[in-house]
Structure formats: structure tokens, C-alpha cells
Regions:
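Residue-level detector of anion-binding/catalytic polar loops
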Residues: 85
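TRNA-recognition modules of translation machinery and tRNA-sensing kinases, especially anticodon-binding
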Residues: 2
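Glycine-/acidic-rich phosphate or pyrophosphate-binding loops and their flanking alpha/beta elements
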Residues: 5-78, 82
Length: 85
């Protein structure tokens, strides 16, 4: 999971479908909690993947998982500031 919100969403998904073995792999890093008013809700986690930040006609697509998500979002913010969608 990318942040505490995703940990909670993953835990809820695991508990809702507890009929088989499941692993929740967590980072030892102190990850920032993403601003979910700026980025998409963690509820998309149940789909397996989801878009956190989108643009009308993207020039670049950044893909990340887990602890790398905050780095990808920082890159996204820098690209937007430079006028790259």
C-alpha cells in the first residue's frame, strides 16, 4: 500500500473476503499519508489498481506501486509545474 489510507482499504477488503489466504505486505519506511482531497480515494484499491491523478490529454503516464507512489506523485507535481500534462 502507498499510505495509511490504502492499508485501511486493503484491510477492509481482506476482511470482507476472508475465505482464502491473503498477505498484506507493508513497507518499513515512514510513508507520507497522501492528501485524498487532491488525489483519488483509496477505495479504488479493491480493483487492484487505480488512477490517483489524471489529466485530459496526458503527455506522460507515471505508474507506481507501494512506497514508490509518493515519489511518482512528486514527479507528477513537478511536471505539472513545468507545463507537462
Amino acid at each position: 500500500p502507498a499510505d495509511a489510507n490504502e492499508v485501511a482499504a486493503a484491510w477492509r477488503a481482506i476482511m470482507a473476503d476472508a475465505g482464502h489466504p491473503t498477505a498484506l505486505i507493508l513497507s518499513r519506511q515512514a510513508l507520507p499519508t497522501l492528501d485524498r482531497t487532491k488525489y483519488a480515494s483509496a477505495d479504488g484499491l479493491a480493483k487492484g489498481a487505480y488512477v490517483l491523478a489524471d489529466s485530459e490529454n496526458p503527455e506522460v503516464i507515471l505508474i507506481a506501486t507501494g512506497s514508490e507512489v509518493s515519489l511518482a506523485l512528486a514527479a507528477h507535481d513537478k511536471l505539472v509545474a513545468q507545463g507537462v500534462a
